[in-house]
Amino acid sequence: MSLRVAVQMDPILGINIDTDTSFLMMMEAQSRGHKLWFYTPDKLSQEDGRVFARAQPVEVFADKGAHARLGETVMLDMKDDIDVVLMRQDPPFDMAYITATHFLEKVHPHTLVVNNPAEVRNAPEKLFVTDFPGVQPPTLITSDHEAIYDFRARHGDIVLKPLYGGGGSGVARLLADDPNLDALLELHAMIGREQVIAQKFVPAVSKGDKRVLLVDGEPVGAINRVPASGQVRSNLRVGGRAEAVELTARDLELCKIIAPELKRRGLLFVGIDVIGEYLTEINVTSPTGAQQLKRFTGVNAAEVLWNRIEDIRANGG
C-alpha cells in the first residue's frame, strides 16, 4: 500500500536529523514507498469549506546538510490529494496552532490526521493530565497570584510553568522563601493573559524526567532526560541529556490508566513525562524522543506508528 503523506512541521531544512522525531517518521514512511510532501503551518488555507496546503514534494536522506530534497511547490487539496497528515509543528499552542487544528478537522478522518486535530486542540498537555486524578504531584492552575502564594505556603518548594508552551521554556523552581515569586508572576502577566501552573517540586527530577512514547495507547519504550547540573529542566532542547532507561511497573500502570482515553480520542502518537511516581504531562502535539529511543534500544517508534497507520488506512479509517 502506497500512501500520500503530507507533513505539517517547522522548516525542514533547519532540523537536526540526529534528534528530530519527525525526520525519523519521514524516513520510515519513505522506506515503505509512501510519497511525502512538506509544508509549514502558515501554508495551510481554507476556502469555501475546503482545505488546501501549498506544499512541496520531498525526499529525505540520512545526510547532514543535504537531508531534504524539495520539489516544486504545488497546491494540495487536503481531502482529495492526501491520505495521511502528520501534524508535527512544535508549540507554542497559540491561536495559530488552534486554527490549524480547525482546518485539519474538516478533512479528518477521510484524510487520517495524526494526531486527531480536534483532540489535539482539546488536550493541551498540561491540562489533559488533570483528567486523571491522583497521577500528578499537587498542582494548581490559575492566574490568581494570591492562590499561588497560598499554594507555596502549603507545599514549600514549587515549580512555576507557563500553561501553554513547550521544550522547558519559562519553567522555574522557587524555594519556599524565594523572593522572586512576585517578579516571575509579573513577567508571566506581561507576556500574556494565560494562567500559569504551580506544582509541588519533586526532588526525583534530579535523577531524570522519563519520556515514555506510546502508539495508540501502548507503550513502545522510554528514555530518561537528565537535567544539566544545577538545573530543574530536563528537556533536551534546554540542555538535558538523554540516557537509556527501563520501563518500571509504575510507568506501565500510568500508561494503562490513560490508554483507553488516548484510543478513544484518536491520539495515535503520544509522549508522557514521568518524574518519580508522578505523571506530569501528556504531550499530544509534537512528541519527541524517538531518535534517542532507537539509538539506545533499537526500538523504532516510527516503525510501530506506521504499522498502525497502515492498518487503519487498510481498514477504511
Curated annotation (Swiss-Prot):
Q: Please list the cofactors this protein needs.
A: Mg(2+); Mn(2+)
Q: Recorded E.C. number(s)?
A: 6.3.2.3
Reaction(s) this enzyme catalyzes, per UniProt: gamma-L-glutamyl-L-cysteine + glycine + ATP = glutathione + ADP + phosphate + H(+)
Q: How is the cofactor bound?
A: Binds 1 Mg(2+) or Mn(2+) ion per subunit.
Q: Which Gene3D superfamilies match?
A: 3.40.50.20, ATP-grasp fold, A domain, ATP-grasp fold, B domain
Top class in the EC scheme = ligase
Ranges for the ATP-grasp domain?
126-310
Asked whether the keyword Plastid is assigned, the reply is no
Could you tell me which pathway this protein works in? Answer: Sulfur metabolism; glutathione biosynthesis; glutathione from L-cysteine and L-glutamate: step 2/2
The Swiss-Prot or TrEMBL record annotates one GO molecular function as: ATP binding
An example Gene Ontology cellular component term from the record?
cytoplasm
User: Which keywords does this Swiss-Prot/TrEMBL entry list?
Assistant: ATP-binding, Glutathione biosynthesis, Ligase, Magnesium, Manganese, Metal-binding, Nucleotide-binding
One Pfam family here = GSH-S_N
Chain sites annotated for binding ATP: 152-208
Question: Does this entry carry the keyword Ubl conjugation?
Answer: no
Residues bound to Mg(2+): 281, 283
* Stated family: Belongs to the prokaryotic GSH synthase family.
HAMAP family associated with the record: GSH_S
The UniProt entry, under PANTHER family, shows: GLUTATHIONE SYNTHETASE, RIBOSOMAL PROTEIN S6 MODIFICATION PROTEIN
What is the protein name stated in its UniProt record?
A: Glutathione synthetase
